[in-house]
A protein has these predicted regions:
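Boundary/linker segments flanking structured domains
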Residues: 1-60, 64-166
């Protein structure tokens, strides 16, 4: 896909998905995949997928981090802590993790049984990647189905990707 402004987008390269409990259990295993420090987008889903996610995996939350911040792995850590209810009095670190925690309680699903996977590519644009991921999972923001995100990803001002559309 050519987005103009001299950037050609390649397909997102996915790692995972992993059961969240399995990912945490492997935290001391140097051979297990771990989220990168930056340049990533992630998906939390109820079910597994192969190669790349689709709406069939019951997607629950899409996220990433913006700019050149080295906080991508930290964001996933914040999400996992809040997903397991490790927040109180509105002082959590990740609103998506809190939404997922509520969904898990309502649906009687243990947070550790959810799946998480992340993707990256070169060249990298965080906004384009989030918009692309949402467009893989839903035909429009209004029909996002099971996604718990409260707002759709912002448009990419650099490459002209529209909000929530490829």
């Amino acid at each position: 896909v050519n987005l103009g402004v001299s950037m050609t987008v390649t397909t997102l390269a996915w790692t995972g998905p992993f059961r969240i409990s399995d990912l945490l259990a492997a935290c001391m295993d140097d051979d297990h995949a771990w989220p990168p420090a930056s340049k990533g987008v992630y998906l939390v889903s109820r079910d597994d997928w192969r190669d790349s996610p689709s709406s069939a995996c019951h997607p629950l939350y899409v996220g990433g981090n913006t700019g050149d911040s080295q906080r991508f792995c930290t964001r996933i850590g914040d999400l996992i802590a809040d997903l397991h209810g490790l927040w109180d009095g509105g002082t959590g670190h990740h609103s998506g993790g809190q939404s997922l925690y509520s969904w898990c309680r309502t649906n009687k699903v243990h947070p550790g049984s959810l799946r998480i996977g992340w993707a990256t590519r070169t060249p990298w644009c965080d906004r384009c990647a989030e918009v692309e991921l949402v467009s893989l999972l839903a035909t429009s923001w209004e029909e996002r189905g099971t996604l718990l995100n409260k707002s759709r990803p912002p448009a990419c001002r650099t490459h002209g990707r529209e909000r929530g559309r490829p």
